[in-house]
Amino acid sequence: KAIEAMERLGGKYPIILKTLTGSLGVGVIKVDSESSLHSTVQLLYKLDPNMGVLLQQMVSVDYDIRAHIVGGKYHGAIQRPVVKKDFRSNVSLGSKPSKIELTDLEIEHCERAAKAVDGLWVGVDIFPSKNREKTPPMFIEINSTPGTKGYRKATGENLAKNILIKFKNREIWLKPNTYKSMFDS
């Protein structure tokens, strides 16, 4: 099935394979050929027959952007340069983040992406277009548990603390539990 999915991406290598349970850049693999894809999927299946994977087109860039969307609204973003001698831009792997301002178009698309997954707080990872004012970004992924270390390094803001303060008195936390077990009458 991975080979079929690869062909739907256009059949051009290299591609990126991601495990659905990875984080911090772990589980992100650059695959250079069909035989490498086959071997990688076999290994992952051997480790966990239920492991889900995602295939993505490889895009060569100097950096990506992580936009933090909190409560459906854009909060801020960081630019993450690709790590030297690697293809990933995770802060946990050594990327040196810096604060970046998004265009109105980028903010609109990132907020729409967060709304699509119903995320209270998500990290939307994008590749900016060449004409950032007029052309939408390319989406990499939406992280339901984004890290805050890079954001704090780049901005000095304690994002996690500010999010907790923002959500402290929200109605969502005050709703009664409506779930019942089979033993409840």
Model-derived segments and their meaning:
Residues L24-E111:
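Phosphate-binding site of ATP-dependent enzymes
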Residues G25, N143-T155:
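Glycine-rich phosphate/pyrophosphate-binding beta-alpha loops
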Residues P14-L17, G52-L55, W121-V124:
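A short linear hydrophobic-aromatic micro-motif
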Residues I15, G76, V122, M138-E141:
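Protein kinase-like catalytic core scaffold
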Residues A67-V70, K134-T148:
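A short beta-strand motif that forms the metal-chelation/ATP-contact edge
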Residues L20, M58-V59, H68, D125-F127, ...:
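Anionic group-transfer/hydrolysis microenvironments
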Residues R88-T135, K166-K175, K180:
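A long amphipathic alpha-helix within ATP-dependent nucleotide-binding catalytic cores
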Residues K1-G27:
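A conserved helix-loop-beta module that forms one wall/lid of the active-site cleft
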